[in-house]
């Protein structure tokens, strides 16, 4: 999904054509009742796109590139039977579609407006693409027969007391809790980064005997928050050039069960994961023709961690930390990353580590390019009045 969002960001900025195809022969039609051994089919190696001049990206095997010197770049993103095609060359787009339809039974869906449950809204004047999942939220509410009674400005209370509980298999399951958490997890992965921290808490208790009514109540609060922010979407693209930056944060003190890690140690682990993702994104953007002009900047709000990485200091309290977690320091020494300090209030990653007050939560959502849309049709399932959080200015 990260590759898909990055591709859409580049496509929106360049104002490329964005179309989709759906293959009809991906799965076998018969129902197998016996164990059958088969030889690998000739088409399994994927020679169709190679014959059309596409090469597989070394960064993501589902991304195929064709970068001729005389024609605009052409990108194809494949997910099982769904293909996303992006290029500025309309004649080449029609030719590739025709060749694919000759080799496979597929349906031309035209311009991309939905993908894997995501609604895609494009504003070519502003060169933006907005991703939403309001339809999926409505389906989840209908399937669970959920009716909200109170709109929420945040997905999780900043005073929550959810913590680890001993396993008690005699406790009856509190509703469809695992199913609900799974649905919310997919929303968070695709278009709702504001749900990352609440789901990191709720997902710890999906096992039978682990969740109690209070956990189900917390999950229902997330649903109320989704009702309040149903028309909000993730905005990609814009006219500014691509600048790759990252934010890392950790909050071991907010762990109500244990607080065993020091703040510096937790920040080192978080910095290593963020540096790894930035390093990978650098290669992905290079494949898409948007190689960063300077090393990406990783912002952290812990000065102790910054000192260990920048000054190559050795402290007796950090000797137990494996060297692999000092990836940020290694990349900085190579000139492939730059570490910088940022105040906690300006650290975007803070929303991923703790439950915030409504004003702080909304501010970080804005920093994540997560805005309210000027489209009230997604509120038809609920009240004719606009829900909380929708009456905001559409921002670029």
Regions flagged by a language model, labelled:
Residues 184, 243-265:
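RNase H-like nuclease fold core
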Residues 8-16, 224-248, 290-292:
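Structured nucleic-acid-interacting core domains from mobile-element enzymes and related host factors
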Residues 22-25, 45, 56-87, 100, ...:
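Catalytic palm active-site di-aspartate
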Residues 114, 205, 243, 264-396:
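RNase H-like nuclease module associated with reverse transcription
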Residues 27-35, 255-260, 307:
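Cytochrome P450 core scaffold surrounding the K-helix E-X-X-R motif
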Residues 1-77, 82-105:
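Metal/cofactor- and membrane transport-associated sequence elements
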Residues 2, 7-8, 109-232, 343, ...:
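C-terminal reverse transcriptase regions that engage the nucleic-acid substrate
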Residues 7, 22, 38, 49, ...:
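Mobile genetic element proteins and their domesticated derivatives, centered on retroelements
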């Amino acid at each position: 999904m990260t590759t898909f969002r990055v591709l859409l960001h580049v496509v929106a900025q360049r104002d490329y054509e964005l179309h989709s195809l759906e293959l009809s022969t991906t799965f076998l039609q018969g129902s197998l009742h016996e164990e059958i051994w088969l030889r690998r089919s000739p088409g399994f190696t994927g020679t169709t796109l190679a014959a059309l001049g596409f090469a597989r990206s070394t960064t993501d095997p589902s991304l195929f590139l064709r970068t001729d010197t005389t024609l605009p770049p052409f990108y194809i993103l494949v997910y099982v039977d769904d293909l996303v095609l992006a290029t500025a060359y309309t004649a080449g787009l029609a030719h590739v579609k025709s060749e694919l339809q000759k080799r496979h039974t597929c349906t031309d869906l035209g311009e991309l407006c939905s993908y894997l449950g995501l609604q895609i809204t494009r504003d070519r004047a502003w060169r933006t693409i907005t991703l939403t999942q309001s339809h999926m939220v409505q389906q989840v509410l209908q399937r669970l027969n959920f009716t909200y009674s109170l709109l929420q400005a945040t997905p999780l209370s900043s005073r929550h007391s959810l913590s680890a509980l001993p396993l008690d298999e005699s406790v009856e399951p509190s509703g469809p809790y695992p199913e609900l958490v799974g649905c919310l997890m997919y929303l968070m992965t695709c278009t709702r980064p504001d749900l990352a921290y609440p789901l990191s808490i709720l997902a710890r208790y999906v096992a039978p005997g682990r969740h109690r009514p209070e956990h189900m109540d917390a999950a229902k609060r997330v649903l109320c928050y989704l009702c309040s922010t149903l028309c909000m979407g993730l905005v990609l693209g814009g006219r500014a050039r691509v600048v790759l930056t990252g934010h890392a944060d950790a909050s071991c003190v907010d762990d109500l069960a244990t607080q065993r890690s020091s703040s510096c140690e937790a920040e080192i682990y978080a910095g290593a994961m963020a540096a790894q993702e930035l390093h990978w994104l650098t290669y992905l953007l290079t494949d898409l023709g948007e190689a960063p002009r300077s090393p990406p900047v990783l912002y952290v709000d812990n000065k102790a961690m910054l000192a260990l990485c920048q000054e190559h200091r050795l402290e007796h309290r950090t000797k137990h930390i494996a060297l692999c977690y000092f990836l940020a320091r290694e990349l900085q020494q190579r000139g492939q990353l730059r570490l910088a300090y940022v105040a906690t209030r300006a650290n975007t990653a803070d929303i991923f580590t703790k439950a915030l007050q409504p004003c702080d939560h909304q501010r970080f959502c804005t920093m994540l390019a997560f805005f309210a849309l000027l489209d009230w049709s997604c509120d038809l399932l609920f009240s004719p009045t606009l829900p909380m959080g929708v009456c905001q200015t559409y921002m670029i």
